[in-house]
Amino acid sequence: MRLKEIISKIEKRHSKKIDLSLNRTFNLLKKLGNPQNKLNNVVTVVGTNSKASMATALSAILKEAGYKYNLYTSPHLQSYTERFVFNNKEINENDLADLLGGIDKILGNDSATVFEILTCAFIKYAEYFKDNINIIEAGLFHRFDSTNVFKQNLLTLLGVIHLDHLNWLDNKTIDGVIYEKTSSLPISNIFINNQMNSEIKTKIKKSLIENKSKKYFFGDNFN
């Protein structure tokens, strides 16, 4: 019940469910001590479909191999706790209520969307397990998504891209979608994309031409 009350409270923090901007996210992260700069081993997961599948599959592989991970995904099926996994274990309701309640107090009179608050909460709590591999699924696109706060990644997983959420775009084309999802991706030790459509894959490569990540593309480097 306490978690539901806190969620209800933070839902009133901003008039819009989605408001594409990074200003509020960085403002809250600054109040939290910029925890995004203290996390290592960040894995960013972006795409149109299959983001959650890729993230959970990677977490299963890491667990089997004996690694510890933190996992942030959205949306959830039954409880907000499903979105938060730390040290290979889903957070419990009491701990999440404490976490979000603390974040809400620190935010003060400033505004932020629910997703922005949840993302910042995950990043802050992950500090306690900062040596773990941090798997973070992007929300809407990536450029102005609250998960886009890391300067460098261990790994970027880019799933299949196709037309989606066009109501949020001025450029309502596949080029517009690709730009929003890829132009802001951080430099990663490894970048993997499983785009099968050759035309879209070519556009993705063009968008990433200045990104110095070591890139692997389906059909080019693996099958």
Task: Give the residues covered by each predicted segment.
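ATP-dependent carboxylate-amine ligase
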Residues: 1, 151-152
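Short, basic phosphate-binding NTP loop
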Residues: 1-45, 54-67, 72, 76-81, ...
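ATP-dependent carboxylate-amine ligase catalytic core
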Residues: 22, 29-30, 35-39, 64-151, ...
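Acidic, Mg2+-coordinating active-site environments of NTP-dependent enzymes
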Residues: 40, 130-137, 153-223
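Conserved beta-strand segments that form the floor/walls of ligand-binding pockets within enzyme
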Residues: 44, 85, 157
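Catalytic cores of secreted/periplasmic lytic hydrolases that degrade extracellular macromolecules
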Residues: 51
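Surface-exposed charge patches
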Residues: 60, 124, 206
